[in-house]
């Protein structure tokens, strides 16, 4: 009986399958089959009879299999296998193919085919009609069947190798082949029993005779699926095994064993028949080899036996098979009934569903009708509301248009006022120009025409402007102002008689009768005769201009460039007044302290006729000088004094004495000293009684337009009387243009020039003086040393973005000024690092800690027994000395009395030691031992010399005594020039060498650089022979490069080119690195030059013993003179590398090498001194000047020093010495003290060690050398550290230096007011700010928020809960805690909130952020809360002078007496800040512009505190305004007062009583329900209950702006240009009234 064929699975690679439990787990978790089944079930109709038919077929197949006997088993299995193949190819093919891939069916045997069916079968659903008892019976039958199958399975010995029954189906190969062979082995074929043979013959007899099989020699090899394994039972013998009943619904155990009983009866029946005839046939032996034929004997049955057997079989079938078929029929009937019931239930379900749907449709029809009715009603209501809103909108637009007209008229009125004032000023200047002979009637008409403007027909009813009336009024005011000036001037005039009559006639004439055509051109006045000197042409023109404005009673500003002789022109003008008008004073000259002596010298030099009083000195000296102020004979030549020269400080201190005299003329030198109109100096000098004022300033406009106004108001108080108006005229627009914010009005600038023209005269050097030498300015970029880099990096790492933002977000002027001072301290620390690191910490001399050891007394016994037991006074002298074996007598007897070779002292003959030498070495102590060693060392060189030169002499006994002489490496044996001496380390250490080892190193070949070529060319250029060599090379047509150095001149616009011939470049030939083997290597100095930490003096010993005293004396004297000499020489050899002194004095070279600037300066000064130049070195820090002084001492440069601490008398002498003595090489000056008024033309080189904030200060300093009288070319070197804060400071200075081109010649500028944000931009550049910002954001995002903080935040900010019906349950107030007793509207509640709440900070577009300060030292900061999403912009001005920023004293720092040197101490109290990554209104699920507690167009206006009202309000965006409004309203439990607020957002100006509904936490009015059910329309939007706050969609803002403004400051931004900024509401908004900007 052959095994049925099994379909072979798809071939796939042989690999170990996954374990069964993992496969089941993956199958259980795989949702794809479930989804596919769901799709199929949804697509398939509800009634399908295919599955039931298949189930009936399967059951019938099972029944037929049970009913057939063993002879039909193979046929049934063949049918099942064919059906199995059809099932695999049916609709379940995909699932069975997947299952087939999970198992290995290659070695499937017949006894495990049922397992194949089980694995590939689908799981059947339970029968719904089966009862619980039937289910239990079925479980029991399955259990019995399982036991029987297990028993039959293990009967085969081949199956013992498997761990479980399914083994072999889970893997493609057997991993325990050895165990399989050991278990199964080679089995013999089992012989069949007679009963088996009988049963086989009966089966063959029923089948009928078969044709004999023919031999097939070439039969193909059987398939692997049908061939049994070794030790496995072949499929033909499976009949003898009983596998039990496989029907699923067996009812009892008797039926299970029916097949076995049936076979037994057949066997017993066959034994009763007689023997049949035997037939021999040739058949193939199963399991044999191919072609093997055996003979089998078979017995043929007779007809009677067959008939009896047939009868027996029919009886059995009638008894047992009929009942079984009946049961099958009943089961089929039951299943049919169950299917019918199931179909009936489904039909009822469908009908019921249709009924429900019809009912729902009926209900929805009524509901839809109602909803349509509501929608129609809502539509018409909405139509009426829209119509009403449209009407209101038109009315509101008309009202707004009326307001805009009123505002436009007001703006025009302000513009007309400013225009009128400017026109009046221009008209006044025109009248003055006419008096000077420069104006015309056309200019007057042009000026008056500026008051005309076009009329607007729409505004004609409200605008009453009359241009003609304004022209008359402006002309009258200008005439009145000029008349007042004339009257004031006339009161001071005391002329000669010939001039008095002309003055009276001029006074009677009115201003209107001024001749329109005065002198067509001013003629230059002659040089005064009393002036002892020669004026240049431009100086005479300047004196003439001064005389003309003096005639007209006008004060002026002589603003010639520095170095053009303003002092000489003013002195010549004073001589002209005295000579032409007969007015000899009194004249008051006020100048800085450094130029007082210069004025006195110039006066005595050029005008010796003037009586000059130098008013300075001590109070007693000044009191004596005031005695000469006799007011008799004033204005005459016989007066006691004509000119008083004093300083600004003395004028302020002695103001009461100066104000008693009516000065004829007051000259203020370096007038920028009164640039601040708020200073006491400016106010006191303005109150002086004088006829005219003259201001001398090389830089009249240094920083801002306010300084220009201060100077103009000082010379003409009646005209420029309003600082605010002047600021409105020019300052705001020009400064905005300078900061690249707005465009510049060229017409406005031209009008400003027109105003300044009569009062100011300015010439520059290149226009008036062609004889002045050139000036070259060179920027020298210096690198930072390692020490500077470490300090600079450490300072930078301590800067935090939050700290800078906290400093830049001050709310008051006081906090802003303190923030600016703190930031300036940071800047000063960086500048110190760039100048020299020793400004922080000096390298002082270090010495070890000196300590004295404890002194104690030694008992006599210890001293005698332990120390002097070998000396003569000792009692044990005989024991230690007399009886010693090294005694001379004993050694003598041992050697010579009885010559004994074995004597213990026989080695002395080989060592060249005598008896006395032996005693000295052993008994006389260390001194004698060292002396003996010294003698031996002196003898070795002699022996080596004798051995080296006396070659013919035979070897002496020293060969035996000194065998080391034969060593070739002996130091004494080596020649003097031997290289081997380098390997003797003792020689190197004795010579204080740092060689510590020998090793290998490499040298690499590199190409020559241009610097090396320049150095070689400069050296060769000095020798004529080398120049000739260069000419020879040029003749050979070699390429010679040239380096061109272009120098720009300030006096001339040409360019000089100097050529330096360079030597030919060395040809570069790449070579391999050269290796040096076994070369001495030096040790780093830090390893052998370390200073001691502790040093102790030698200990003194005391003992009550005379012998101890004698031994100490002998020890101190080293026994004898030879011992002293030996000790001194030994100490000399033992001298350390750095000497015996333990004090470590820093090397002066480190002073140079520690700073990159000083290192560059050292090389520069060396070159300048070699070329014969003289140098001025400027620095702002006096401590830096101290370091430069130390450097000058170190380099032996002769120098002088002048700074703010120098006395006035000493300054004069120092300047005179430097001008006259040529041996003084360097003049060290402070930029502020030594940069004004002094003449240092003896120097031709100026070096700025550090640059000033103000470029004009540096310009004045360099003009001390580049001025009249300078004959050499002036070179200016400016030392700048590359990549540091100095580069940004220099860039700012360059922008500020263009102010003169803006105001005087046209241009732009930067103001000098250092605001905190600008100082931050100096500290960090754009990349560093962005990098620090990203790092901080990354740290904040990565840091986990504690659970307690999250729970607390959720408690304070609960989210809104929205139910399905549409009712919105509002969140409680974020600021009011139900557990607190304090009301949320009080200030105490706000303080509690600020102390506990942690919120994020959102940064706006303008990059200005504000933080919540919790420091108790700043109450103004702690009382203001900040709304997330809002940005604080504060307009603060710091009107401070530069002297407050850089102190020119002993210390350059900004710290007070009690302040620490740590510049970050003020930043320690800054609270941590967080940044909101998602601004409100931009998160998912919320519309743009909306917030958590309000919409985009919030209706609640913001309430500002008086602190906020101090600064102009800036309109905010809709989202930020809503956030601010809702934040203020959420914490208010009562309605706000009915006050209008301007600038509160979109609804500014709306009374607060209309917005009371917003004040409740839920946003609804109290007592009104707003629930809306399904289908109900929304409430009317016009009511306050559900008024929408959602605005129109707008573009998203950038998420990550920079925190610090770089290009411009938001403080000066007009409100209309910064829509993204808004002020944060005050915590007291619920209790205080609203205050808006006026």
Curated annotation (Swiss-Prot):
Region (Disordered) location: 41-93, 201-259, 499-528, 1335-1364, 1463-1638
Location of Phosphoserine modifications: 47-48, 67, 70, 227, 230
Record-annotated Helicase ATP-binding domain positions: 547-718
Biased composition (Basic residues): 212-222, 1473-1495
MF term (GO), any: transcription cis-regulatory region binding
Pfam name, any one: Helicase_C
Cellular location(s): Nucleus
Any single GO CC term annotated in Swiss-Prot or TrEMBL for this entry: chromatin
Bias type Low complexity, positions: 1505-1534, 1618-1627
Catalysis performed (reactions): ATP + H2O = ADP + phosphate + H(+)
Domain DBINO: 313-438
Biased composition (Basic and acidic residues): 55-65, 512-526
Similarity comment: Belongs to the SNF2/RAD54 helicase family.
Subunit structure: Component of the chromatin remodeling Ino80 complex.
Protein's recorded name: Chromatin-remodeling ATPase INO80
Gene: Ino80
